[in-house]
Amino acid sequence: MYICTLMRNSYRNLLILTLFTTLFTTACSDFRKLQKSDDWEKKYDAAINYYEQGEYYKANVLLEQILPIIKGSEKAEIANFYYGYTYYYQEQYLLASHYFKTFYDTFNRSKFAEEARFMFGYSLFKDSPRYNLDQASSKEAITALQGFINLFPNSEFVPKADSALGQLRSKLERKAYEKALLYYDLKKFMTGEYLKAALVEFDNFQDDFPGSEFAEEIRYLEIEAMFKLAEVSIYSLKKERYLEAIEFYENFIDTYSNSKFQKKAEKIYEDSLEQIRILNT
């Protein structure tokens, strides 16, 4: 009895596999026939059907074939719009952004124009890499999304654009923070030059990200870097740089009176005063 049951189950599974294989082979054969067909209307209908069923690769292939043929026709609008999405859903975000922008530029009076303009920027956002990689595409995405918000301030897509902008700016902030720390950490190799570079990066960071979660740490490191730079400076520059360290400290304490870096900052302040006293004797 057990063996008979196993045989029935195996036979049923074989039938299912055979049926699936047949359907798959038939579907592939139908798609290949469509690719070779000269009937653009048939291709158009099939492409729309594939798209609506989530078969974006097949939809993309057929749309690519017919877009030059239907250019200027009524069907060109929806075909071009879907074409952008076929790339987006296949995670080819740079191509998607290109075709969404092309759609907006070509069909700027379309009912899909607003969405296409948003998707141009959002596709660039999706292509944005981790913060530790080059952020050129993130900057491009920020420009595109901010441009969308400026054009369509009341759009239903604005909240999603705002969220993407926040994430992109956080990446740029983290990238700038890590870059500043890198220069500071390299001081052990070429102390003076890297300290100067770190101070420039600290200053740039504060200008670009005034409300950053890293602002307090950067302001403290600025004090420390200036003090260390004073230590390794030639005699004629020492006093000036110790005075700058003191100024950085005073500005820091005014802003962060209860900072976790307060004790360290005070120590640098006191050491700077002592060094100036010695230099004045």
Please place each PLM-identified region on the residue numbering.
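Bacterial N-terminal signal peptides
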Residues: I16-T25
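Acidic, polar-rich low-complexity tracts and alpha-helical solenoid repeat scaffolds
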Residues: Y2-C4, R8-Y11, F24-T281
